[in-house]
């Protein structure tokens, strides 16, 4: 999930902030695509509470074509559990990819 530091909604974005958001979306999608078991990245915006902007990045598992379209957020309830070690490895791949263009990887607490 990507969220703003300030409490704003998409309608509050300036053109400059919108341009930065677009660049960040592309960076995250490219980073997630480095994971060899991700077929596609879906980007969604939900939230009906005022001034809370969140984008959700959802990875469709490679080869799971039945997970097309808007139903992807519901599939997590029926998919088999994802391997915990693989999940951590993918998180590291994404973090390292994002850090290549500035920033640093922050290790999660155990």
Positions of the model-derived regions?
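HIT superfamily nucleotide-processing domains
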Residues: 1-110
């Amino acid at each position: 999930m990507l969220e703003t530091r300030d409490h704003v909604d998409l309608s509050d974005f300036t053109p400059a902030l919108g341009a930065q958001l677009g660049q960040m979306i592309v960076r995250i999608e490219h980073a997630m695509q480095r994971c060899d078991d991700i077929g596609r990245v879906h980007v969604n915006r939900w939230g009906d509470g005022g001034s809370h902007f969140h984008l959700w990045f959802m990875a469709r598992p490679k080869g799971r074509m039945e997970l097309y379209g808007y139903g992807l957020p519901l599939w997590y309830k029926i998919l088999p559990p994802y391997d915990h070690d693989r999940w951590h490895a993918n998180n590291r791949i994404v973090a390292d990819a994002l850090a290549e263009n500035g920033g640093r990887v922050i290790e999660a607490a155990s």
